[in-house]
């Protein structure tokens, strides 16, 4: 599969099968991560995500939608305030700032579906840019557990290898 949506809802998947995704990503667009979050949440089967390497920035957002979220012991999890590049006049800068504020609130809403720390604490961690090892991410409720490094890459029901690795 070329995309998460295709993995979950493509012709080779029964759209009810349990899915296990091994994730390694430095992130990307807030909007794309929100779409992936929504796709995972709407999926009728169980979705397990194992962070193997790094889940950073927008990649942490889609992780929040998993039914089960684990990290391997050597993996890292990073949250930070959203950022952008803006060009234009004062009004354009105000608009860019408003979009960033709204994006942060949206991310905090999605974090709030899982984390065991307060929204204010999560916002403070984002403002500071916070890197967490697997144990700290577990303690703060970002992940459900720390797991051993898988010996084999998981496969879906059609036998496809399932790995989202954008950190190449």
Feature map (PLM): residue ranges:
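N-terminal organellar transit peptides
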Residues: 1-60, 65-168
């Amino acid at each position: 599969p070329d995309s998460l949506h295709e993995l979950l809802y493509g012709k080779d998947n029964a759209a009810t099968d349990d899915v296990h995704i091994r994730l390694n990503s430095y992130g990307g667009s807030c909007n794309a991560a929100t779409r992936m979050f929504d796709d995972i949440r709407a999926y009728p089967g169980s979705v397990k995500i194992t962070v193997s390497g790094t889940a950073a920035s927008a990649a942490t957002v889609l992780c929040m939608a998993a039914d089960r979220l684990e990290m391997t012991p050597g993996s890292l999890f990073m949250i930070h305030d959203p950022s952008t590049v803006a060009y234009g006049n004062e009004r354009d800068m105000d608009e860019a700032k408003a979009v960033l504020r709204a994006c942060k609130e949206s991310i905090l809403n999605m974090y709030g579906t899982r984390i065991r720390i307060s929204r204010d604490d999560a916002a403070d961690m984002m403002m500071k840019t916070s890197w967490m090892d697997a144990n700290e991410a577990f303690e703060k409720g970002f992940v459900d557990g720390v797991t051993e490094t898988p010996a084999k890459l998981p496969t879906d029901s059609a036998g496809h290898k399932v790995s989202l690795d954008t950190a190449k």
